[in-house]
Amino acid sequence: MTAIDVSVFAQSQDPDFTPALVGKPWDPKRNAMVFDAMGEIRDSFTDELIEEILASGLRAISVTCGNPRQQNQSVEQNYQSALEEMLWFDNYIEEKPQYYIKATSTADIDRARKEGKIAIFYLTQNSEHFMHDLDNVNAFYGVGQRTCQLTYNYQNMAGSGCMERHGSGITDFGGLLIEKLNDIGMMIDVSHANVRTALDAIEISKQPIQISHTTCDALFSSPRGMPDAVFRSLADNGGVVGITQMRLYITLERYGAVDLYFDHLMHAINVAGIEHVGIGSDRDHRRLVVTPEYLEEMQQEQGERFDISKVPLYFEELNSPRRMEVIWDKLLERGLSEDDVEKVTGLNFCRHYNNLIG
């Protein structure tokens, strides 16, 4: 990897930096519901970090299994990648029973809240791992998958992603897949889909669907954002939209722009309604420092898609395992009641999961 001057990221260099917005410690007596509908858990997390994440109130998270970048893989590779990662998470959770619970229903969230642990749900950010065989939906359900994102960034057999130049909507196979997912009780996610695919899926599905991690195209134009029409249609059909914490889909400003993130949350609430908005961070919960090692990690993960101009990917004020406390306090400042804040931080997605998977 070519050497990169990291001094341009000076605000991210102090590993002991504490975001100024982090206020009082989370009150465990409040026991508010905190659910990250699309986040990351890594084996590099130390016990100390996990305990800090727990102290922030997080009690449920959905994690991506497999490599969703299907254009670089065969469907067989997608199948193997998704299966191997689900089995890896099985082992990882078993090795840390003091912190984690493998989750397949909201009863596992209830248990996590009672025991002070994190319930981990499995999702895929693509449907290619089914290898165009609907019987494989049953197989992955049996392993523990509870959410399927229909597409990633490009065209697949189900529909079209947001980066496809001449994309379709839901395909004939995609319609059959939606029907199968409805029947078996696996949730449908249209994050990364193009607008037509998202609207088609909402119309075809007999069950509410979700957009676990997106932004508001009305505030900042990005391929990963969704227009208000999608939010309204989703809400009208009982779904939930999660707003991502990925800065590059919200602003080009590297620092000092965290209020724009809360603008997106409030806009989604105003359009879809307070019952239909949640959090899907699309990030892990580490405190990140931009170093050559971190940049190399990003380059390995993203390959040719890696763009140094987009670093840092996060808002510095949310760059902490205590970020959910920041979100709680800032939404109160925006005028929401504590009851409504809890809907956004977790209850809405918890209700959605309960309605669809029990």
Regions found by a protein language model. Give the residues of each.
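N-terminal hydrophobic targeting/anchoring segments and the immediately downstream early-domain regions
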Residues: 2-166, 221-358
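Divalent metal-binding pocket/active-site signature
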Residues: 128-131, 140-225
